[in-house]
Regions:
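Positively charged, low-complexity intrinsically disordered regions
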Residues: 13-14, 28, 45, 112, ...
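Proteins with a high burden of low-complexity, intrinsically disordered sequence enriched in S/T/G/P/A and R
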Residues: 8, 41-44, 96, 187-189
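Cell wall/extracellular polymer interaction/catalysis modules
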Residues: 59-211, 219-259
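N-terminal targeting leaders of exported, membrane, and organelle-targeted proteins
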Residues: 55-57
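Polar low-complexity intrinsically disordered regions enriched in Ser/Thr and small residues
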Residues: 9-12, 31, 52, 157, ...
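Bacterial N-terminal signal peptides
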Residues: 36, 42-53
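N-terminal secretory signal peptides that target proteins for export/translocation
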Residues: 1-39
Length: 259
């Protein structure tokens, strides 16, 4: 025995491999329990957030239904769902107003409504034109192709105003992939037009038609444009748009905002 090493240090305790395993298991259990608590908290937070979002969406549906009972419930639900989807993706989070167009209604009838969600008021209930190549009184041909002179559907985000060939107009960004992404390139804008004449529509059997723009009466063009400009939404319902109410299926893209 090498005495230079001195007597064993009794203050230094050793543990067996088995005891080390037990201690490690205990620490693992504590860590696992902590992870479970953290995960459960995150799940609960996400669940609460989802519940609040659903509640807000339901509130808007109920509000619009009361303010504009002429709009079919399914169309309202579709429009609000598409709007909320865009907002969850960071577009129009401060939007206060939503316009809904139902292109399954004849052009001779009022088929465009503008609702102020914050003030809880119906601002407009009006006629709106569809593209000349989309159909006679009700659009049956829909296109997002440049030069098609057809109406495009889906969710639009309003931008700035300008004065062009049709007077005071409002730029629109198409947010619905496969439906209206070419809106900026097609120069699809909101403007007033003399051919949007409800009285003439009675004798003609249809309202005057546009080159694809959601044109309105000249008399109400400016106030309606001012009500919607700068970060609000317009939703155009028609054939096939029900799919746009499903957020998360990549039916909506924000890429067109860079156009």
């Amino acid at each position: 025995m090498d005495k230079s090493l001195g007597p064993p240090d009794k203050s230094r305790r050793t543990t067996s491999p088995m005891l080390d395993m037990v201690n490690t298991a205990k620490r693992g259990s504590v860590l696992l329990a902590t992870l479970k608590i953290t995960t459960n908290c995150k799940i609960r937070v996400l669940a609460i957030g989802a519940a609040l979002a659903f509640s807000a969406q339901a509130d808007d549906v109920v509000l619009i239904s009361k303010l504009a009972p002429e709009i079919r419930p399914a169309v309202i639900e579709e429009a609000v769902a598409a709007m909320k989807c865009a907002q969850r993706r960071g577009v129009g989070v401060d939007a206060r107003r939503l316009a809904i167009i139902d292109y399954t209604i004849p052009s001779r009838e009022q088929r465009r409504w503008v609702v102020d969600l914050e003030a809880q008021k119906l601002l407009f209930e009006e006629h709106v034109a569809h593209g000349e190549k989309s159909g006679f009184d009700i659009p049956t041909e829909i296109s997002d192709l440049n030069g098609s002179h057809q109406t495009s559907l889906g969710l639009f985000y309003t931008d700035a105003t300008y004065h062009g060939g049709n007077g005071y107009s409002l730029k629109l960004h198409g947010l619905s992939e496969g439906f209206n992404q070419s809106a900026m390139r097609r120069l699809i804008v909101m403007h007033g037009a003399a051919y949007v004449d409800p009285q003439a529509a009675v004798s003609m059997g249809r309202l005057g038609r546009s080159l694809g723009c959601p044109a309105v009466r000249v008399e109400i063009a400016r106030p309606m444009i001012d009500a919607l400009k700068g970060g609000n939404f317009i939703y155009s319902h028609g054939p096939g748009t029900a799919a746009l109410s499903r957020c998360g299926d990549e039916s909506m893209t924000l890429a067109s905002l860079a156009d």
